[in-house]
Amino acid sequence: MLTKRRMKFQYISCLAWLAHYDIFHLVPRDKNISYADLARAAGVPEQRLKSILRMAMTSSLFREHPNGTDVGHSAVSALLASDDDAYSYATYMCSKTAPMAMSMTEAHKRWGASTRTNETAYNVAFNTDLPFFDYLAQNKARMDEFARYMRSVRSSETVALKHLISGVDWESIPAGGMLVDVGGSTGGAAIALAQAYPHIRFTVQDLPENVETGEKAAAASLPADIASRLTFQAHDFTLPQPVRAADAYLLRMILHDWPDEQAVKILRNIVTAMDETKSRLFIMDTVLPKPGSVPISVERIARARDLTMIQSFNSKERELDEWKDLITAADPRLQLIGVTQPFGSAMSILEIQLSAK
């Protein structure tokens, strides 16, 4: 077992090395190249290159010609060479996720059970006193890398927008009703819903730079019948919600980034705007399974996401009971009226309303 674990660390180290020396792009897409020529192009020793590539080949990255002197792409390495988002996912895993994971022990030694967003494994790994997103914002290249990484994550079948579209009875919102996508980035979720449900109006809220990007893209590419139902609004969700009495508020992949104290504050800011006679709040996020309640391969992925939240933000993925506690802590009047996990989705949808009591 320990030997297998060692193989995984070595695979990550090979992936990082190959990306650093641009091997994915130096190997031609449609033909082989000799180890000697590839080593010269990359400026690395041929024997070192050969050792690292042959290790990578045991996990389906690249392939060696039977002559033993040439190398070409496999299906996986060709994908990474041709798809910028997939490549960014791989490089982010090597340059950010792996160092974070290895810094978790040191973070705990320094700060114990702190939930401060700038006392994390991420802070240790990258020697910064800034919270995750503040550190990203300092450097456009880091921001762009993270954006590509998130595009790759969101292209996964398990977090596809189709699960949001089919996972709620959106027809129950009356004609002309308003849905507010809180922290909706550049509007991807709202646009998908607008295409599927032409009777609903949408407000997408995010920080100014995301709102500006989304607004420009929508104006340039969306048909008038969709663009006319879509509004972008700059808003920090740690502040009170400005759109009052909407029919629905959506928090998709938001609260898992925040420790309980801040997550409660985000919820309270929405509660102050809700109308108890009609408003509903939908949270689409991971609901952690109970140990042993799902196949181990599924549970392993969920546990890995939980650790990533700890290492990045001192936050967490939450079990259902933890979600219930969080909702009650935000406001005892909030009632969880339904939990749905669409087939094939890694996330569940929690439907919440505000009672009159």
Curated annotation (Swiss-Prot):
Transmembrane regions: none
EC number: 2.1.1.-
Regulation: induction: Expression is significantly up-regulated at the end of late growth phase, in the presence of Butyrolactone I. Expression is positively regulated by the pgm cluster-specific transcription factor pgmR.
Pathway in which this enzyme or protein is active: Pigment biosynthesis; Secondary metabolite biosynthesis
Molecular-function GO terms, alphabetical: O-methyltransferase activity
Disulfide bonding pattern of the chain: none
Binding site for S-adenosyl-L-methionine: D206
GO biological process: methylation; secondary metabolite biosynthetic process
Keyword field: Methyltransferase, S-adenosyl-L-methionine, Transferase
Active site, UniProt feature: H256
Pfam family, one: Methyltransf_2
Catalytic class of the enzyme: transferase
Null allele phenotype: Abolished completely the production of the naphthoquinones derived pigments and leads to the accumulation of four new compounds which lack the O-methyl group, including 6-O-demethyl-5-deoxyanhydrofusarubin and 6-O-demethyl-5-deoxyfusarubin.
The family this protein is said to belong to: Belongs to the class I-like SAM-binding methyltransferase superfamily. Cation-independent O-methyltransferase family.
Role description: O-methyltransferase; part of the gene cluster that mediates the biosynthesis of pleosporalin A, ascomycone A, as well as a third cryptic naphthoquinone derived pigment, all responsible for the coloration of conidia. The pathway begins with the biosynthesis of the cyclized heptaketide 3-acetonyl-1,6,8-trihydroxy-2-naphthaldehyde by the NR-PKS pgmA.
Record-given protein name: O-methyltransferase pgmB
Gene source species: Aspergillus terreus (strain NIH 2624 / FGSC A1156)
Gene behind this protein: pgmB
